[in-house]
Amino acid sequence: MAEDRPQQPQLDMPLVLDQGLTRQMRLRVESLKQRGEKRQDGEKLLQPAESVYRLNFTQQQRLQFERWNVVLDKPGKVTITGTSQNWTPDLTNLMTRQLLDPTAIFWRKEDSDAIDWNEADALEFGERLSDLAKIRKVMYFLVTFGEGVEPANLKASVVFNQL
């Protein structure tokens, strides 16, 4: 018999494509190429299949990670990497040391509607978000698209229980 305790209220916080920041990072790559310069030591340059997403913490305290909500409307793969960067891209570049482990990887196979994921890492990453929410209003993510998927094919959010 299931317990009859009330279910905790939940918050579903979407990951939103930050087009301005993605564009700014792409311009950085183009600028370096045009001037024939190299990236700073340890700098993470945005690759063509990567985009920057943000999560606005509408609540920062008393959150407990519940689950990822990821929908891919076609087969492919996305890797979501958190960053420790509090971004002011006109002043600071993203450095590789600011990329957080573990990453969350989600994929959809050709003949399936179901989303698979690297469950242990995705759960550990999600649990870290509850802690990071306490000290941030916004968190940035680097999302890498693979196997034919692009930003238009992804809908992602993080669901938290409100304690």
From Swiss-Prot:
Keywords: Acetylation, Cytoplasm, Olfaction, Sensory transduction. It is found in: Cytoplasm. The keyword Cytoplasm applies. The modification N-acetylalanine is found at A2. Uniquely associated with mature olfactory receptor neurons. One of its GO terms (biological process) is chemical synaptic transmission. Gene3D superfamilies: Olfactory marker (2.60.120.390). One of its GO terms (cellular component) is axon. May act as a modulator of the olfactory signal-transduction cascade. Belongs to the olfactory marker protein family. Interacts with BEX1 and BEX2. This is Olfactory marker protein. It comes from Homo sapiens.
